[in-house]
Regions:
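Conserved SAM/SAH-binding loop
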Residues: 127-132, 152
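Short amphipathic alpha-helix with an adjacent loop that forms part of the alpha/beta core around
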Residues: 130-140
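Segments forming oxygen-rich coordination pockets for charged ligands
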Residues: 1-108, 112-125, 139-143, 183, ...
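ADP-ribose/adenylate-binding Rossmann-like module
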Residues: 106, 143, 147-151, 159-185
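A short acidic, amphipathic alpha-helical/loop segment
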Residues: 95, 156-161
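Adenosine-phosphate binding glycine-rich loop
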Residues: 172-257
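Short, well-ordered alpha-helical microsegments
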Residues: 89-90, 154-155, 178
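Short phosphate-binding/catalytic loops that engage adenosine nucleotides
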Residues: 101, 166, 190
Length: 257
């Protein structure tokens, strides 16, 4: 729910209801353009399940009057499921926590999957990865990161993960490992469309070598994937830096139709 809390008197207390994909549901802040601008800015807050304050308008393209808008969210934090209690997982759980994810680290090996090793994780689970995934809740905002690098864990886990309506599935390993990793799921009936969802090798090419650098690489890919970013330097692009969210574009198309 977006509510005008500061601006010209005729706009005060106007509200706009937004859905999880940032498309508008009901109400208005003062016009279609202002509504679309607000929806675009609130997408990150909605994904993170956070409240916040945004500024809308003050220009001819959206609304001549500048509006201060308070965004109330009614959603839990998105989940990041990290499989494999390795050093990279410790750095990734810290980065995920920083980005507002509810982080779970899962590994079947009791000696490695301990809260002491992953202080930034909300949950540390000792279980076979595919069994835990089968029993836990996921949604379109969930990011699944497979760092186990072991076929006996990877294959059943990826087979399940790629069939679920999650936002991101990535797996660590070399290109050769990736090629081998695709064979077994195919034999088990995983479709080509499902395999195409797999981000492997995981992360963007940042030249990272350390666990911390690799965590930045992985989370950068997750962010780009969620917001349909290119992952390219902004200095190489043209046009607006902040593009409308996919849900906003869809809403605008429906309105135009």
């Amino acid at each position: 729910m977006a509510q005008v809390v500061d601006g010209p008197e005729e706009f005060l207390d106007r509200t706009l209801s937004l859905l999880g994909d940032s498309s508008t549901d009901e109400g208005t802040l003062g016009g279609e353009r202002a509504d679309r601008a607000a929806a675009a800015q609130t997408r990150a807050l909605l994904r993170a399940g956070r409240a916040g304050r945004i500024e809308v308008g003050g220009d001819a393209e959206t609304c001549p009057d500048r509006l201060s808008v308070l965004v109330h969210t009614h959603a839990t934090r998105p989940r990041m499921l990290v499989f494999g209690a390795v050093d990279f997982a410790a750095a990734l759980s810290r980065a995920g926590h920083f980005l507002g994810y509810r982080v779970a680290v899962c590994d079947a090996r009791t000696v490695f999957a301990t809260p002491a090793r992953f202080p930034h994780a909300d949950e540390v689970i000792v279980e076979w990865p595919h069994r835990y995934l089968a029993d836990t809740e996921v949604d379109a905002r969930t990011a699944i990161c497979v760092l186990t690098h072991d076929a006996k864990f990877d294959i059943p886990l990826l087979r399940l993960a790629l069939s679920l309506p999650v936002g991101y599935v990535g797996a660590m390993g070399s290109r050769r490992t990736h090629d081998h990793r695709l064979g077994a799921p195919r034999e088990l009936g995983v479709s080509e469309d499902e395999l195409a969802r797999l981000c492997s090798p995981i992360g963007l090419d940042l030249g990272a070598r350390t666990p911390e650098g690799t965590a930045v690489s992985i989370t950068a890919e997750i962010i780009a994937h969620a917001h349909q970013g290119t992952g390219l330097p902004l200095s190489r692009g043209t046009g607006p830096i902040h593009r409308p969210a996919p849900g906003v574009l869809a809403s605008a198309a429906r309105t135009a139709a």
